[in-house]
Amino acid sequence: MSFRPQNSFHLPLLLLAAATLVTASPAASHAQGKAMAPMSPELQAARAALAKYSDPIVAVRDGYFSTVACIDFPKGATDGPIVYPPGAMGVHFLNTANIGPVLDPAKPQILIYEPVGDKLVLTAAEWFMPEQVANGKAPSIFGQTLAGPMDGHEPIMPPTLRHYDLHVWLWKTNPRGMFTSTNSAVKCKKSAAYTVALGEHHH
């Protein structure tokens, strides 16, 4: 599916960013079930720079806005050549001001939180670039090439928002690896109004 020309990606992103904010108590650093895998100095620096966002209110103050839904793939999913193992992502907070042709380790476009009790706990960051901005070349960061291009992930973005992305689980161990999109250790409450369980096939 082709992406709209010019700067049309701004409108859906801004509409997405204007979504109702999730009300949550500030969250402390998430205790891990097991030790985190060793991180490169670059990843350690990114984790330290983003630690302030363990409080989601600080994230909102700095321009991140909740997309509300807790994204879960209980049976895994496929999206063309991209495979999502069984697991969840969580609640995405998007900062449209960070979208551009250069990826900054200290300025991810998306922060990801897990609902735990009555709080949101920071678990991961996501580097995201619309296909139009990437200008035909898959971007990379932390020695990893972003997955894509792929259609926008409904229901939190329009399918016309084709993009590249990379999830990095900086604060919660991912049994399948730090750069795997879904995390089997992350849980979305099945009874919660805003939990979105996606089926075996994304599209």
Segment roles from a protein language model:
Residues S2-L14:
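Bacterial N-terminal signal peptides that target proteins for export
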Residues P12-T23:
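Bacterial N-terminal signal peptides
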Residues A24-G33:
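Boundary at the C-terminal end of the N-terminal hydrophobic targeting segment
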Residues Q32-H203:
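Primary mode marks residue(s) on the alpha4-beta5-alpha5 output face of response regulator receiver
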